[in-house]
Regions:
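Active-site and adjacent substrate-binding regions of carbohydrate-active enzymes
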Residues: 1-220, 224, 229
């Protein structure tokens, strides 16, 4: 909110564009949140601050009123209609960068596909949506393998400070039980997409010969079942 409400941010971005990116005809991608409906043309297009920006329309569907613990389930029809609306709207100005997941979001396979429907076919369909939309598909590491959430069942396995603080505050205040909060973290924690890339079925999935900063994806599919090799 501090950045959103400060006058002159647009002028600063224009100065940045003029004196850096524009000199080299550089392609730029912005990350913009809480943008008003009539502001898209200020950020992309011929006169925009950036060449394009990430489209977070689908991700905003799982924003709870108070955080993760009351985040709503992503309904398929709402998800479909939201993406379609965004695609139509952006055509007036240019194109956007389409994403399914990133380092701050849970894995798309676990987030958008009902657990009972997760399969190679449904994973490929989700990938097809991302690459066939108008715009630029951005692929996050592990997404090309169909990696899922990690589903850590112990708080000690998490490294994301937001996840740890969120769990601690809500359980110590008595607002939520530890069991409920663990389920929330399994679904929404940023650590779900921050586990090491799985290269093969060797120790540590071929990512390192040492100990990684965080556990591997140790539930099904395991590194033996899901790796680049």
């Amino acid at each position: 909110k501090m950045v959103e409400n400060v006058d002159g941010v647009g002028e600063f971005l224009e100065d940045l564009k003029k004196n850096t990116f524009q000199k080299y005809d550089a392609f730029t991608v912005g990350e913009v949140f809480n943008m008003k409906a009539d502001e898209l043309g200020q950020f992309i297009g011929d006169n925009g601050h950036f060449s394009t920006i990430f489209d977070f329309c689908a991700h905003s569907l799982s924003d709870g009123a108070h955080g993760w613990y009351d985040a709503p389930h992503v309904d398929f029809k709402t998800w479909r209609d939201t993406i379609l609306s965004s695609q139509i709207n952006v055509q007036k100005y240019g194109l956007e960068a389409n994403i399914i997941e990133n380092h701050d979001e849970p894995r798309g396979v676990s987030h958008y596909i009902p657990e009972s429907d997760v399969s190679d076919t449904s994973k490929k369909m989700l990938a097809a949506v991302n690459v066939m939309l108008r715009g630029l598909p951005f692929i996050y590491q592990g997404q090309e393998l169909g990696m899922t959430n990690v589903y850590f069942d112990k708080l000690e396995d998490y490294r994301d400070i937001e996840s740890i603080n969120f769990f601690t505050e809500l359980t110590e205040s008595g607002l939520m039980t530890p069991e409920y909060m663990m389920k929330c973290l399994m679904l929404r924690s940023r650590d779900n997409a921050r586990t090491p890339m799985q290269w093969d079925d060797s120790k540590q999935a071929g990512f390192t010969e040492g100990e990684p900063w965080i556990c591997l994806l140790y539930t099904s599919p395991s590194p033996r079942d899901l790796s680049t090799s």
